[in-house]
Amino acid sequence: DTITVGECSGVTLEEAKKYARSDEKELNMVFQFEHMDVDADADNKWTDKKMDLREMKAVLTKWQKGLEDIAWNSLFWENHDQPRSVSRYADDSAKYHDVSAKMLATCIHMMQGTPYVYQGEELGMTNVPFTSIDQFRDLDSINAYRELVEEQHVFTAEEMMRYLCRKSRDNARTPFQWDDSAYAGFSTAEPWIMVNPNYKEINAKKQVDDPESVFNYYRKLIAQRKEKEIIVYGTYDLLLPESEEIYMYTRTLGEEKLLVVCNFSEKEVAVEIPEEFRKGSYLIANYPKGEIKEQMTIRPYEAFVLEK
């Protein structure tokens, strides 16, 4: 068996419906990038603009509802051309790193479509604290620095380094962090690019046997998709579209229903739980499970899924 995936940068919803219709033979799914532009200016990605969660929800919901019963979504936060999601959309500090990585995984893996996990994402690998343009290997980053700093003087060197550390593709292209040995266990020789200095804290060896690790949380999410048809085939409906902190949606398949709640902020946020879920149970959670009740306080970067 084979599947066909079309990398369709700039594709419209109507075009995607034509390319990946379930009753046609062109593609099995489209890989579109509209949600990757939420934290960029219209004509410039080199910025430290933060994501507006309301806009992110609107874009992802457009694709969830627009392809429903017609075509199939690819679900992703990361790839080789994007920075690390835990640094980009959440909080990669030691305090919130693990819950942030698990929250992002919950949000995307509970949607309709096929999730893609980019190498290192399942560990919560982070952006890299580059300090010099000489440390970069990505031509897009190197050329942008030359043009915008040295030739056109649009940004100072300090400004551009800040933007590169946030958005450069090299953030996702450092060696995979296997263990805490030299070069993160990737090689016995010096790699082509620096290893992220946090490799002793974030690596596969440390996480594989830890039941509470980001890695094993991903395993749980993937197992649930194989066990529960509602995660694969259920319809998606957005709740709280105007919330600047909470991404909440439901999945429905027949009489089954799931509620997905994700806090994209470091604030504690009070949320009203829909009545039909108040006597439900947890499917998965990235914090110790609290009592399910009408009003719940959602902790920083908390995520959970309730079954009706």
Can you describe what each PLM-predicted range is?
Residues 1-281, 285-308:
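Active-site and adjacent substrate-binding regions of carbohydrate-active enzymes
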